[in-house]
Amino acid sequence: MKVYIETMGCAMNSRDSEHLLSELSKLDYKETSDPKMADLILINTCSVREKPERKLFSEIGQFAKIKKPNAKIGVCGCTASHMGADILKKAPSVSFVLGARNVSKISQVIHKEKAVEVAIDYDESAYAFEFFEKKAQIRSLLNISIGCDKKCAYCIVPHTRGKEISIPMDLILKEAEKLANNGTKELMLLGQNVNNYGVRFSSEHAKVDFSDLLDKLSEIPGIERIRFTSPHPLHMNDGFLERFAKNPKVCKSIHMPLQSGSSAVLKMMRRGYSKEWFLNRVERLKALVPEVGISTDIIVGFPNESDKDFEDTMEVLEKVRFDTLYSFIYSPRPFTEAGAWKERVPLEVSSSRLERLQNRHKEILEEKAKLEVGKTHVVLVENRREMDNQIVGFEGRSDTGKFIEVTCKEKRNPGELVKVEIISHSKGRLIAAIKGN
C-alpha cells in the first residue's frame, strides 16, 4: 500500500505529516512521490490565510481526476479542524477529515467513509504527546508545545490548534537523545508560541521555562545546533535574550514576527507590544549578538491600516534590515475578531504596499550580501551539489541562518560542520569556498 502526502503551510504541518507517515507505516503503507500510484492521498492543510484554503479544493479536484479508482482522499490539518464536515459537503470525493490535533487517529479513519475527527477540546491529561519513529536525518523537527493562548485579532490558529500545552521536559529530552543517537545534528524546536514554553503542562511537573529547556538540550551529546520557531516577541525579555546569546549550541538566528510597524495597527491586532517596544528588543538583541540573523512576518492591508501606518512598517524594515521576510496581504479568517470587521483596505492599495515592501527588502538583501564577502561562517552540510555526476560542492546554513552554496571538489557528508569563506554573491545568494583553500 502506498500513501502520498501533500503538505501545506508551516513547520508544524511538516512535523504532523511526518507523524501521519509514521502511523501509516505501522499499517505497511510506504510513501510515494507520485499521487497516481497512491492508495491513499492525504492533504495536510493550512488555514492561516484564505489562499491555501482555496487551493485545497482545487487540489482535491485534481487528485480526484488522477487517482487510482479505489484510492481514498483524506483532508487533514488546520482547515480540517475548522471546516470539518463542510469539506465533505463541498468535495464528495473526500473520504474523511482529520483535524490538526487528531493525527494519531489516522489508522482509525482510513477505513471509514465520510468520517470526521476534528475535536480540539479533549481532556488535557489524556493528551498523548506522540513522539514517533522518524527517518534518520541531519535536521529534525521536535515538538515542545502545541496550541496557542494568544488572542491576535487576525489569527485562526487558537481555534484550529486549541489551547496551549507544553510537553514535559523529560519527554522532550528523551526524544532529543533518541534523535541524536539516530544521527540528528540540528534540532528545530516547534510550537505556536515556542518561547512561552512551560506555561502549562498536561500534568504536574516542575516549573521550567524555555531557556531551561534550551540549556538542557544543549547538553545532549551529538546535538550540535538548536533552532526554534515560532516565538512571540512579548516573551523576549532580557533574561531570555542573555541566555540565548550565551548558549553556544543555540543558533544565532531568531524569528521575531513584527506583523506591523505601526503601534496603532499592533494595538488593533492585539499583539501586546508597540513599535518602540519591538525596536528596543531588537536593539538589545543586537547589543548581545551583533551578527544575529533576524527573520520576521509582516501583514499589509490590515483593516484601517493608513498610509502613515504603512510608512511606520517601512521605517522598521529600514532600521532592523531583516535577513528574511515573510510578507502577505491581510486575509480575513473565520473565528477571528478582525474577520468580522467591515473595514477593508482596497486590494490595489494592499498590493502596492506589498510590492514596495518586498522590493525594498530585496534591495536590503543585496546590500547585506555585498558586506558578507570575505567573512567566514561555519556551515552545517545539508546537501551535496553535483553536476554531470561530479561533486561541485554542497549547500547548508550558517549559525546565523544564512543559506550558503559552497564550491569545492572535496566530498563533504551531510551533517559535517565546515568553515567557509564568502567569495561572491548573486541576487541575495551567498557563494563560498572552504576556508583555507
From Swiss-Prot:
A UniProt-annotated Pfam family: Radical_SAM
Annotated compartments: Cytoplasm
PROSITE patterns reported for this sequence: MTTASE_N, MTTASE_RADICAL, RADICAL_SAM, TRAM
EC annotation from Swiss-Prot or TrEMBL: 2.8.4.3
UniProt-annotated binding residues for [4Fe-4S] cluster 2: 148, 152, 155
Co-factor: note: Binds 2 [4Fe-4S] clusters. One cluster is coordinated with 3 cysteines and an exchangeable S-adenosyl-L-methionine.
Domain MTTase N-terminal: 1-115
TRAM domain ranges (all copies): 370-436
Entry keyword set: 4Fe-4S, Cytoplasm, Iron, Iron-sulfur, Metal-binding, S-adenosyl-L-methionine, Transferase, tRNA processing
Enzyme class per UniProt: transferase
Listed InterPro entries: Elp3/MiaA/NifB-like_rSAM (IPR006638), Methylthiotransferase (IPR005839), Methylthiotransferase_CS (IPR020612), Methylthiotransferase_N (IPR013848), Methylthiotransferase_N_sf (IPR038135), MiaB_methiolase (IPR006463), rSAM (IPR007197), rSAM_horseshoe (IPR023404)
GO cellular component terms attached to this protein's record: cytosol
Cofactor: [4Fe-4S] cluster
Chain sites annotated for binding [4Fe-4S] cluster 1: 10, 46, 78
Gene3D superfamilies: Methylthiotransferase, N-terminal domain (3.40.50.12160), tm_1862 like domain (3.80.30.20)
Top-rank taxon, per record: Bacteria
Catalytic function, reaction form: N(6)-dimethylallyladenosine(37) in tRNA + (sulfur carrier)-SH + AH2 + 2 S-adenosyl-L-methionine = 2-methylsulfanyl-N(6)-dimethylallyladenosine(37) in tRNA + (sulfur carrier)-H + 5'-deoxyadenosine + L-methionine + A + S-adenosyl-L-homocysteine + 2 H(+)
GO molecular function: 4 iron, 4 sulfur cluster binding; metal ion binding; N6-isopentenyladenosine methylthiotransferase activity
Family annotation (PANTHER family): CDK5 REGULATORY SUBUNIT-ASSOCIATED PROTEIN 1 (PTHR43020), MITOCHONDRIAL TRNA METHYLTHIOTRANSFERASE CDK5RAP1 (PTHR43020:SF2)
Family membership: Belongs to the methylthiotransferase family. MiaB subfamily.
Subunit-structure text: Monomer.
Role description: Catalyzes the methylthiolation of N6-(dimethylallyl)adenosine (i(6)A), leading to the formation of 2-methylthio-N6-(dimethylallyl)adenosine (ms(2)i(6)A) at position 37 in tRNAs that read codons beginning with uridine.
Protein name as catalogued: tRNA-2-methylthio-N(6)-dimethylallyladenosine synthase
Species of provenance: Helicobacter pylori (strain P12)
Gene: miaB
